[in-house]
């Protein structure tokens, strides 16, 4: 679990997301409150429930990007889902309970990786011994049983030294490794994913733990043996329990496109993929117990962050019970020309840096001038205003169009430097930006 302070979290998000300070602060406080809650005594800790967040803002301003970056910072079970993928219980489609099942699966993977990393040193020792057993088989007595030697032989010690120094890396050995589990692909209708995974695990267990002799270079065998030995040192039951605890205490669910499940106007008949989904989300957000293949999971202390553009619907179109369970509202602002300029230059791996690196692989040096950056930002903003406003995503479209000619001829331009200034941008984009019909279809 992350122990970063809110200021540190915001600072980390600033490296990738421009503006939207209110949203960053709310998310940072929510994440820090998870840590604060764990410092309380058990009785009070049980009473403190997370304050769920609803992020409202037009498309392309950073809602989903905040979720992506938060997943890396949280160091806790995290899952991002699209609200539009779910239907009401009893109809064809995914049930909302599958969110918690997927979150638990993610937690099991995360906890397994942590447990393997914790046992890595011991696993390396065991893997080393197995390789030495192949290189210098231990002495056997008259009954064919391996004798336990008090002291390793001089030859074994010499080989151990060579192995650690990497002198034997390219030597081939034949070694017994655990055979890969039997792979069974099962096609199931939507909504039956849980049954499919249970059947697959059942078929895999039928195969048992078979050993298979393989001929490998020592450096490759070492990697596989370390994984195998580390997996043996992990207790599966303990791992499942740790994963369930991690989900219940630190789990975070990000629900995107929640505005798409708002009811629009009066309609007769069941609304299975809109209001029905909202009703099914209520118990999850409020707190209930969900059955997963790893055990029962309580959702009382899972943090839910929902986001939506709300261009057609309004937050008040959500059913009142769900509105009440998303108490913190954060509005994200539409992006301006100056925001676009910052997006093109400030993030760690901004789009311009990516294009420079891509063209450098062909030996072409690309230079973006300040005037060029400003003109690209103005063109993107202008197209957003005259057609549909898709936020920062418009920059990808504009830049791809601008770089199309260079990308096509890159192999012939090796060794050259191309300067992209305001004149270059105007020459390639002005006609498209000015013609609304063209920009509607091309940009």
From Swiss-Prot:
UniProt keywords, alphabetically: ATP-binding, Chaperone, Cytoplasm, Nucleotide-binding, Stress response
GO biological process, one term: proteolysis involved in protein catabolic process
Coiled coil: none
Induction profile: By heat shock.
Pfam family, one: AAA
Cellular compartments per GO CC: HslUV protease complex
Gene3D superfamilies: 1.10.8.60, DNA helicase RuvA subunit, C-terminal domain, P-loop containing nucleotide triphosphate hydrolases
Major subcellular location class: cytoplasm
InterPro entries in UniProt: AAA+_ATPase (IPR003593), ATP-dep_Clp_protease_ClpX (IPR050052), ATPase_AAA_core (IPR003959), Clp_ATPase_C (IPR019489), HslU (IPR004491), P-loop_NTPase (IPR027417)
A GO molecular function held by the record: ATP binding
Binding residues annotated for ATP, in chain numbering: 18, 60-65, 256, 321, 393
Location in the cell: Cytoplasm
Domain of life: Bacteria
Role summary: ATPase subunit of a proteasome-like degradation complex; this subunit has chaperone activity. The binding of ATP and its subsequent hydrolysis by HslU are essential for unfolding of protein substrates subsequently hydrolyzed by HslV. HslU recognizes the N-terminal part of its protein substrates and unfolds these before they are guided to HslV for hydrolysis.
Oligomeric and partner information: A double ring-shaped homohexamer of HslV is capped on each side by a ring-shaped HslU homohexamer. The assembly of the HslU/HslV complex is dependent on binding of ATP.
Protein family according to the UniProt entry: Belongs to the ClpX chaperone family. HslU subfamily.
Protein's UniProt name: ATP-dependent protease ATPase subunit HslU
Higher taxonomy: Bacteria, Pseudomonadati, Pseudomonadota, Gammaproteobacteria, Enterobacterales
């Amino acid at each position: 679990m992350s122990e970063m302070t809110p200021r540190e979290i915001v600072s980390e998000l600033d490296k990738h997301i421009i503006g939207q300070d209110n949203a960053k602060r709310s998310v940072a406080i929510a994440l820090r409150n998870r840590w604060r809650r764990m410092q309380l005594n058990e009785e009070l800790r049980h009473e403190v429930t997370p304050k769920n967040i609803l992020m409202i803002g037009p498309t392309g301003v950073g809602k989903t990007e905040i979720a992506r970056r938060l997943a890396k910072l949280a160091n806790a079970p995290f899952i991002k889902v699209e609200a539009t993928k779910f239907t009401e219980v009893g109809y064809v489609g995914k049930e909302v309970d599958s969110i918690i099942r997927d979150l638990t699966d993610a937690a099991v993977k995360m906890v397994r990786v942590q447990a393997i990393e914790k046992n890595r040193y011991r696993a390396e020792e065991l893997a080393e011994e197995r390789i030495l057993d192949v290189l210098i088989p231990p002495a056997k007595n008259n009954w064919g049983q391996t004798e336990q030697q008090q002291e390793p032989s001089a030859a074994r010690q010499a080989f151990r030294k060579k192995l650690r120094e990497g002198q034997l890396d390219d030597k081939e050995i034949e070694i017994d490794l655990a055979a890969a589990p039997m792979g069974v692909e099962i096609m199931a209708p939507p909504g039956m994913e849980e049954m499919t995974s249970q059947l697959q695990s059942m078929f895999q267990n039928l195969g048992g733990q078979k050993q298979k002799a393989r001929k490998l270079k020592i450096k490759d065998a070492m990697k596989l043996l370390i994984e195998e030995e580390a997996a043996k040192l992990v207790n599966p039951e303990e791992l499942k329990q740790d994963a369930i605890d991690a989900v219940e205490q630190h789990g975070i669910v990000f629900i995107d496109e929640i505005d798409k499940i708002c009811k629009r106007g009066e309609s007769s008949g069941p609304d299975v993929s809109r209001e029905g989904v909202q009703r099914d989300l209520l118990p999850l957000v409020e707190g209930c117990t969900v059955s997963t293949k790893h055990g029962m999971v309580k959702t009382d202390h899972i943090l839910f962050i929902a986001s939506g553009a709300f261009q057609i619907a309004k937050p008040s179109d959500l059913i009142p019970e769900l509105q009440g369970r998303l108490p913190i509202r954060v509005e994200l602002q539409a992006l301006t020309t100056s925001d676009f300029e910052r997006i093109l230059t400030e993030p760690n791996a901004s789009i311009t840096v990516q294009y420079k690196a891509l063209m450098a692989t062909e030996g072409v040096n690309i230079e973006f001038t300040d005037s060029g950056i400003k003109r690209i930002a103005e063109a993107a903003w202008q197209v957003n205003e005259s057609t549909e406003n898709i936020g920062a995503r418009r920059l990808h479209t504009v830049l791809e169009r601008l770089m199309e000619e260079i990308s096509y001829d890159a192999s012939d331009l090796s060794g050259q430097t191309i300067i992209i200034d305001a004149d270059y941008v105007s020459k390639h984009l002005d006609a498209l930006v000015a013609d609304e019909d063209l920009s509607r279809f091309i940009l």
